[in-house]
Amino acid sequence: DGALVRVQLIAEDLPEVLTVPQQALQRDLGGYFVMAVDDANRVEQRRVGVERQVDGLAVIGSGLEPGERVIVEGVNKVRPGITVDAAPAEGG
C-alpha cells in the first residue's frame, strides 16, 4: 500500500567523469586515497579528490588521470614502494 508521489527527474549534463570502484577507495585523517600501480608495477599511494559516490563507484575529481591503474583487490596486502603482479579486474 504505497503512497502516490510525484517525482521530477533532474538529469545533469555531465562531461565524462573518472570513476573507480568504491572498494579501491581508502580514507585516513588526510582524506581519500587509492593505491595506484605505475608502469614498473610499483605501488604508490595517491591522494584523490572524491566528488561523490554512487552505485558502487567513486567519482574522482583530482589525483588520477584516465588510464591509470588502481588496486581494487588485495589493497590491505600492499604498501607504497613494493612491486606487484597486477592483473586486470573483472570488467576493466
Identify the function of each model-found stretch.
Residues 21:
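Nucleotide/phosphate-binding loop and acidic/charged catalytic motifs
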Residues 36, 50-52, 62:
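A residue-level detector for short acidic-glycine micro-motifs
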Residues 33-35, 82:
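Conserved hydrophobic/aromatic positions in well-ordered beta-strands
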Residues 1-16, 25, 36-42, 54, ...:
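Hydrophobic alpha-helix/coiled-coil detector that fires on Leu/Ile/Phe-packed helical surfaces
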Residues 3-4, 47-49:
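Short, solvent-exposed beta-edge and connector elements
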Residues 31-33, 58:
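Short aromatic-glycine-enriched beta-strand elements
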